[in-house]
């Protein structure tokens, strides 16, 4: 079966997480992703957070499935020639270098366009044009500058970063959409273009409900926030609101049976208006269905702490799964707090391909996420990440069409090996 992006070739200069997230997704959809790595070193994550000595880390393997690896010293004259030929043969170049690195390599946008006018150059940077555009950015910096940290946590505590990698992986997913869009536009124009995604922009895009609340705050208190019911005045910026729901339906994380010893014995419970009467029956408060202090959503807002306190009395008598089973019968929205251990052991996620077991030649079998996007006519098969430089000769011969003699010349030039250190005199 033909893959959705079969025939698209990606020149992958990305490293760590944001860029590899993007190119891995494209590879899952069938693109031929050629990962260009430094000879002898490769992507820095190969050696970070290693759980098995001298073996590619899970950090690397789980972000680089379905790719091919070529090692190339782009400072070497022969290496530059090889890179030029790769640019001619590829559709997209993806990079997440620091600002200006591609230019210093000798391949600015203008030169790439001269080599291949159809080339799409896609870049991830920390910030867009402005006062911070030259600053180095990592995941948590992006969360802090994009509005996530200031609105995450509890009102009386520090700003918090989230466990979800919304800065790195989130921006990588945004860039992947930009690349596919540019490829589609190229079918009409015949021309390449630049695609950029800033990590600050990506985080802010995912925090849009907080930007919504910032504007609402100018017109009055945010009544669905628990501090409204507590009589605590609002300041001039959106506050941290703990586990209050960010939507129009109030929600909280509540204790379940066993919470004293199990750090994940909790459930998220949403008091959705259409099922309010069912909620009242389940928790044993039938009079709340008609009591004017509780019957209508607006009347409940100042009393959310009391209401969720009463609901929690009920959830604490049930395990999170027992509570979920009961609530689902009444169409009451809820969800158990699942630990990573529980998720990893969930067989249903393996059946859907959300989790996949991958066999690696040096580290053996490991568990990874699969493609979260399912296409009916282009099912994704997850294959292992490449060893460093594993496909170098294959790419030189198959993609660039070099002869054995030419490949030998490139090897002899040192373009595929770590730079030699000059001996001390």
UniProtKB/Swiss-Prot annotation:
A Pfam entry, by short name: CoA_transf_3
Single GO BP term: oxalate catabolic process
One function term, GO molecular function aspect: formyl-CoA transferase activity
EC number(s) per entry: 2.8.3.16
Entry binding sites for substrate: 247-249
Pathway(s) this gene product operates in, as recorded in its UniProt entry: Metabolic intermediate degradation; oxalate degradation; CO(2) and formate from oxalate: step 1/2
InterPro entries reported for this sequence: CoA-transferase_III_domain, CoA-Trfase_fam_III, CoA-Trfase_III_dom3_sf, CoA-Trfase_III_dom_1_sf, Formyl_CoA_transfer
Catalytic site positions: 168
Superkingdom to which the source organism belongs: Bacteria
Keyword Transcription among UniProt keywords: no
Reactions catalysed, as given in the entry: formyl-CoA + oxalate = oxalyl-CoA + formate
Keyword terms, alphabetized: Transferase
Keyword Transferase: yes
Binding site for CoA: 17-18, 38, 72-75, 96-98, 104, 136-139
Function, as annotated: Involved in the catabolism of oxalate and in the adapatation to low pH via the induction of the oxalate-dependent acid tolerance response (ATR). Catalyzes the transfer of the CoA moiety from formyl-CoA to oxalate.
Entry-linked HAMAP family: Formyl_CoA_transfer (MF_00742)
NCBIfam families, per the entry: oxalate_frc, PRK05398.1
Subunit structure: Homodimer.
Family: Belongs to the CoA-transferase III family. Frc subfamily.
The protein's name in its UniProt record: Formyl-CoA:oxalate CoA-transferase
Biological source species: Bradyrhizobium sp. (strain BTAi1 / ATCC BAA-1182)
């Amino acid at each position: 079966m033909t893959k959705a992006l079969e025939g698209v070739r990606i020149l992958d200069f990305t490293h760590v997480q944001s860029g590899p997230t993007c190119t891995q997704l494209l590879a899952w959809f069938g693109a031929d992703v050629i990962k260009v790595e430094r000879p002898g070193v490769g992507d820095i994550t190969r050696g970070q957070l290693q759980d098995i000595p001298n073996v590619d880390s899970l950090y690397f393997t789980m972000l680089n499935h379905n790719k091919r690896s070529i090692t190339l010293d782009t400072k070497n004259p022969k290496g530059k020639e090889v890179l030029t030929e790769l640019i001619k043969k590829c559709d997209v170049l993806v990079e997440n270098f620091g600002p200006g690195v591609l230019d210093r390599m000798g391949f600015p946008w203008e030169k790439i366009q001269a080599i291949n006018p159809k080339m799409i150059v896609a870049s991830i940077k920390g910030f867009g044009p402005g006062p911070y555009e030259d600053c180095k950015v990592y995941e948590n910096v992006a969360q802090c500058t994009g509005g996530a940290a200031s609105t995450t946590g509890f009102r009386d505590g520090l700003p918090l970063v989230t466990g979800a990698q919304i800065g790195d992986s989130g921006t990588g997913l945004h860039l992947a959409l930009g690349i596919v869009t540019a490829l589609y536009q190229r079918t009409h124009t015949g021309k390449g273009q630049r695609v950029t995604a800033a990590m600050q922009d990506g985080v802010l895009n995912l925090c849009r409900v907080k930007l919504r609340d910032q504007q609402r705050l100018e017109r009055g208190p945010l009544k669905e926030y628990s501090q409204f019911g507590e009589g605590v005045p609002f300041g001039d910026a959106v506050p941290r609101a703990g586990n209050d729901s960010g939507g129009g339906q109030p929600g909280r994380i509540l204790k379940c049976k066993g919470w004293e010893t199990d750090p994940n014995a909790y459930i998220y419970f949403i008091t959705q208006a259409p099922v309010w009467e069912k909620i009242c029956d389940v928790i044993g408060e039938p009079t709340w269905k008609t009591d004017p202090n509780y019957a209508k959503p607006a009347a409940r807002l100042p009393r959310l702490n009391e209401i969720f306190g009463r609901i929690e009395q009920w959830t604490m008598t049930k395990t999170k799964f027992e509570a979920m089973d009961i609530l689902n019968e009444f169409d009451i929205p809820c969800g158990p707090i699942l630990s990573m251990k529980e998720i990893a052991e969930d067989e249903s996620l393996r059946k859907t391909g959300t989790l996949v077991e991958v066999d690696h030649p040096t580290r053996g079998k490991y568990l990874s996420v699969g493609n979260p996007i399912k296409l009916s006519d282009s099912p994704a098969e997850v294959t292992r990440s490449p060893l460093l430089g594993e496909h170098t000769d294959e790419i030189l011969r198959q993609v660039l069409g070099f002869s054995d003699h030419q490949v030998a010349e490139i090897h002899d030039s040192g373009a595929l090996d770590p730079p030699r250190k000059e001996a001390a005199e």
